[in-house]
Structures are given as structure tokens and as C-alpha cells.
């Protein structure tokens, strides 16, 4: 199941009738990297759509040629008209900037995965295993750098520092605060240790931030010692979300990522002082979302010296 991506998504290669025709489906095409050597992926269910739109706008801000993938983890029928309008707006910005970026959409097929992957379970949110699967699929497809950014994040004008860490060390995730001892449940630690999935569990080390993760497919250490065991763990409940764990005593995907990154000795990650210019978790509602959106579009106008309207209605 790990690599059978066609079973991971509904109607994987088929056009989506309720989205604009420029929105691509299926395998990522090579021309999506004509102007940018990495791919950004994000995803959301209905309750995070607005903040995810803001994040996708910020992809244009950080690099006009950066292609991105939106993974639908549970949008409602009533969401698609709004999504289509916003994707048209982003497409209009791409056109104004003569961008080579591609816009991709895929809908996650939860019915083909274990029941405990259920994103609506507020206790564990399926261990966020669906996120790990989406990242891994794109690493296998593209064989390039894949950047996961949560909806609610705002990417900066320049991601040079973050990307340089990926070029140098094969992976990057900023620090999130507190330690492995506090946020990685003992049952997960035991599973990783007894199954020899890590070299060592460094309990005093800091936690990585699962809201922003980047991997380079062509880095052997990152793939062998972080990505592959991360995926294996994501498919194993005893590893990523043991019984009696919840988000109150365990950090699911972020917990496992933290243990693996430190065990693999990935430099410049998950350590205070080697932080990021990415604005993490700018979750918002109502007026505050609109103001954040205006900030991103205004920043696009300033960076590229264009005059994009602040919204599709302007």
C-alpha cells in the first residue's frame, strides 16, 4: 500500500468537473519544475480551507514559479465554488507574473486506509498519518525536494535559509518547543527502539514542527533514516498513535519526526536558534483572515512590482 498512490486518491488522474480546467490531477509533470526545483504540498478539510488559501497565496510570494499540490482531506460540496474562485485568482496572479507554476489537486481516499486514520477523530486525528502518506507519494513521484506546509502557515518572501538546510542536510523542520521526553509517548519510544527504527532516542532534544517539513529525495541519510521509517511508522498505529495516547500526551507525526530527525543527526533542524522565517500556525477567522490575505497579496505586489487586486472581487 505504501507506494500504490493510485489507491490513495479518489479518481486520481481524472479531471475535476467542479474546478477550473487549468487545475491538474494525477502524477506531477516535469514541466512543473521549469522554474523551481521544489514542490510545495498542503492539504485541509473544510474547517481549514480559508487559511489554506492564504498559505497557497504565500507560495506565490516565496517563488512565483513554485508549483503546489492541494490535497483534499475532506472538503464539503459547498466549499468547491469558493475554492474554484480562489484558484482562478491564484492562476490570474501566475499569469500576470509569467509563472511556470503548476496547480495540482487530489482528494485523499480515506476509505482505502485503516479506520484509525480518521481525520475527524479529535483525540488523535488519525495520527496525521495521511499527511505522511501525501508527502511520501510526492517524493516518490517527483524524486525532488518536497515541502509540506500546513494551512495557516505563511511562507516568507524568500525561503533561502530553509531550502539551503535541505540542500545541505536533506531535510528541514524548525523547532516547536519542549522536548522529546515530554511529547513522545513512552509506547512510541519503545516501539521505535525495539524495532531498531532509530539509532538512539535522544529524550532531551527539542521537538520538530510538523507544520513545516521538507525532504530531499536524493539525500540518502534523509530518506533511509527519516523518511522510510517515518512512513513505516505512519502505517502502524502502535508506533505513531498507540492506544491511550491523544494530542494531550503525544504529538503523533511530529513526535515520530522529532525522534527520527535527531537520531539521523540532521543538522540545523528542530533546534532553537536555527529557526525559520515561515510564519507558523496563522490560523484565523473572519476579518483577521481577510487582513492576512491582504498582507500576502500586498507583499506579492511589492516584491514583483505588479498591481494584483486584493481579492477576486476587486
Residue map of PLM features:
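A conserved hydrophobic helix/loop-capping motif in glycosyltransferases and polysaccharide synthases
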Residues: 39-46
Amino acid at each position: 500500500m505504501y507506494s500504490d498512490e493510485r489507491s490513495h486518491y479518489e479518481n486520481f488522474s481524472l479531471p475535476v468537473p467542479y474546478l477550473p480546467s487549468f487545475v491538474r490531477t494525477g502524477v506531477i509533470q516535469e514541466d512543473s519544475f521549469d522554474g523551481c526545483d521544489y514542490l510545495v504540498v498542503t492539504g485541509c478539510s473544510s474547517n481549514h480551507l480559508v487559511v489554506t488559501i492564504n498559505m497557497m497565496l504565500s507560495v506565490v510570494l516565496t517563488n512565483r514559479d513554485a508549483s503546489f499540490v492541494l490535497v483534499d482531506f475532506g472538503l464539503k460540496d459547498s466549499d468547491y465554488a469558493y475554492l474554484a474562485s480562489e484558484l482562478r485568482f491564484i492562476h490570474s496572479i501566475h499569469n500576470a507574473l509569467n509563472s511556470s507554476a503548476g496547480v495540482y489537486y487530489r482528494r485523499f481516499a480515506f476509505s482505502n486506509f485503516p479506520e484509525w486514520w480518521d481525520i475527524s477523530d479529535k483525540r488523535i486525528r488519525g495520527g496525521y498519518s495521511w499527511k505522511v502518506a501525501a508527502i511520501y507519494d510526492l517524493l516518490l513521484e517527483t524524486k525532488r525536494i518536497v515541502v509540506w506546509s500546513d494551512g495557516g502557515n505563511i511562507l516568507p518572501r524568500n525561503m533561502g535559509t530553509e531550502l539551503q538546510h535541505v540542500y545541505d542536510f536533506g531535510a528541514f523542520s524548525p523547532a516547536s518547543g519542549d522536548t522529546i521526553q515530554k511529547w513522545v509517548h513512552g509506547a512510541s519510544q519503545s516501539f521505535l527502539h525495539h524495532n531498531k527504527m532509530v539509532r538512539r532516542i535522544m529524550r532531551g532534544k527539542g521537538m520538530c514542527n510538523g507544520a513545516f517539513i521538507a525532504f530531499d529525495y536524493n539525500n540518502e541519510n534523509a530518506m533511509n533514516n527519516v523518511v522510510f521509517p517515518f512512513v513505516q511508522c505512519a502505517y502502524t498505529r502502535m508506533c505513531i498513535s498507540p492506544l491511550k495516547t491523544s494530542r494531550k500526551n503525544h504529538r503523533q507525526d511530529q513526535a515520530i519526526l522529532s525522534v527520527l530527525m535527531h537520531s539521523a543527526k540532521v543538522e540545523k533542524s528542530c533546534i532553537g536558534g536555527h529557526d525559520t522565517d515561515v510564519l507558523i500556525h496563522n490560523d484565523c477567522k473572519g476579518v483577521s483572515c481577510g487582513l492576512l490575505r491582504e498582507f500576502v497579496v500586498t507583499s506579492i505586489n511589492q516584491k514583483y512590482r505588479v498591481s494584483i487586486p486584493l481579492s477576486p472581487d476587486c
